[in-house]
């Protein structure tokens, strides 16, 4: 904190932060439309199930959570509004995700000898929008993922934004956006699987 102005004996303070980096970040709405406890619970259960499936390395089940046109996007910065023509940590459609799943589960995948272990924690689940006609929802949440491999522990944290389509089989992911706290940081080795 730094003093910005003095008025008599009172001093007003303003946070000293990197205004340029903060100013261009998109800000999600602070409040949401009223949603039923049942809808909130259904969305939370979906996100918790996704985290458990990822931790168990059940790639086929995880891929089945996506629509056929689904995308998984992890931009480098929160200010990115378009995945096309800009660097991304991940920008994959379902076909590319299938290729990655086969690669990391292949018996000769050196990068997975030994395989990594992960633990996902998802919280702060907020339904931002509900389409009254289709039942589709946009949801934001926070996550923390811990990865352990070869005596190295790595932590990834940030925000998820899911665009979920309501189908006869339940919700399916049309878009999952992952904004890492340290998305523009350096990594000592490549992120092998999804966050």
Describe the function of each predicted region.
Residues 44-45, 118-120, 157:
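Short solvent-exposed loop/turn micro-motifs enriched in small/polar/acidic residues
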Residues 147:
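Catalytic core of tubulin tyrosine ligase-like
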Residues 192-195:
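Short hydrophobic/aromatic patches at helix-to-coil boundaries
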Residues 144:
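A domain-level detector for eukaryotic transcription factor DNA-interaction modules
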Residues 50-52, 108-115, 150-151:
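Short helix-to-loop capping/linker segments positioned immediately adjacent to catalytic or ligand/cofactor-binding
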Residues 2-68, 75:
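Short, low-complexity N-terminal intrinsically disordered segments enriched in polar/charged residues
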Residues 68-139:
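A solvent-exposed, acidic/Ser-Thr-rich amphipathic alpha-helical stretch
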Residues 2-8, 13-15, 21, 134-140, ...:
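Short beta-strand edge/turn micro-motifs at domain boundaries
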């Amino acid at each position: 904190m730094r003093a910005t102005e003095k008025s008599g004996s009172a001093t007003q303070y303003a946070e000293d932060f990197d205004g340029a980096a903060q100013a261009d970040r998109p800000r999600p709405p602070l409040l949401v439309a009223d949603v039923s406890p049942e809808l909130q619970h259904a969305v939370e259960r979906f996100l918790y199930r996704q985290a458990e499936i990822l931790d168990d390395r059940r790639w086929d089940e995880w891929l089945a959570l996506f629509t056929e046109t689904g995308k998984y996007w992890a931009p480098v910065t929160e200010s990115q509004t378009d995945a096309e023509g800009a660097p991304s940590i991940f920008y994959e459609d379902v076909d590319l995700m299938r290729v990655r799943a086969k690669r990391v589960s292949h018996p000769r995948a050196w990068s997975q000898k030994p395989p990594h272990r992960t633990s996902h924690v998802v919280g702060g689940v907020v339904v931002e929008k509900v389409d009254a006609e289709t039942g589709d929802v946009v949801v934001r949440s926070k996550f923390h993922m811990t990865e352990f491999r070869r005596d190295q522990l790595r932590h990834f944290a940030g925000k998820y934004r899911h665009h979920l389509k309501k189908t006869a089989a339940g919700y399916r992911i049309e878009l999952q956006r992952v904004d890492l706290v340290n998305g523009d940081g350096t990594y000592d080795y490549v992120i092998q699987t999804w966050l």
